[in-house]
């Protein structure tokens, strides 16, 4: 009898909880303000999400935008997510100082990135942002371009054996190794030689990004206990990758700490030339940063600056391979500037006199943004149109759809670098072209990323003609934009 009563009590409480969730969903302030994709009470959009895969996510959201408009909402068990590609709503969300908390799904990254700049909030975020910002000062970026140039030269040499014009080359993994060498050297002052060796660190980074991409697509895997229960092999591999990278980072931190201690005894200590040096010299309230704080920031920098640059550079080279006239125009600009000396290095001041290169990069980022969506979790109510989005709601910004909106860009699917020189550029609203997000919590390293991207593209185009070979890209969103079919080109040495 007691068991029956306990079961009845549990069932009653469950029904009551479900009723409250259903009522919360029906009374949500967004109901009637933006369309809802949810058709089944409580279950909400979960039924539609069963078909979501990295390879079709961009098409699914494009379909929803077409059916429901630029902004819509979905629910799962009473939890509401608003999705938007509407510039007015994006402006309201990103521009203020009150909506700085990252979306809930980002916290799957905490095991690797800890409380680094991507995931921190409040005073901690403001403090670290202030400490890290000087790392991207002009004088330090100038030193970083030397690293970009040297590692890009190694990439160019590695491509030489593939440049006979009759072989399809998936450029993505090759660019990825160069980007990893660049990010580790600029972040930590060490070279992992990813382009020349089969590194354990390289494998760990690849494993973690692949696992995290899968978790982002499956909401139940965002919860640590369910992740461990439902995907034990993925959980174990993620743990192994995190341990590998944390041990690597901890070792480098100790090495750099000893180096800086020796330099402190010299008359003229060297200037900081890596993010790690800046962090080791920094203090908060008179106290140095802890090893964990430093490790979290370095790992965040590597995570944010590796795959994103790989994606950006690879898709840019792909577009150039498919648009011969654009590639030739860019090559002519580079030849006019650098002449026929293929060994002349790239320096920061070069980019001020290469306007078409800038347009090519901007247009490539518009068509293939490395991060196709960003998210915020509201810290206070946000007023939009005739209603408001309540505190605690996750809002997803569809950069992919925004940057391909025909109401904003003429012929949005056409690769047209000239649009960034012509009449179209000045009439864009501030929140229409935001491949690096926008507002106070935009990408802190966007200048770094653009310079790295320009350097790598410059080096490759000066050495090789890119040919339209291999399968076309099939976009796949795994946190960062990738391609299911590879990012394929052909290569032929330039004739001067």
Swiss-Prot record:
Heme binds at residue 443. The keyword Oxidoreductase applies. Its main location: endoplasmic reticulum. Keywords: Endoplasmic reticulum, Heme, Iron, Membrane, Metal-binding, Microsome, Monooxygenase, Oxidoreductase. The keyword Membrane applies. GO terms for cellular component: endoplasmic reticulum membrane. Its EC number is 1.14.-.-. This is Cytochrome P450 4ae1. The gene is Cyp4ae1.
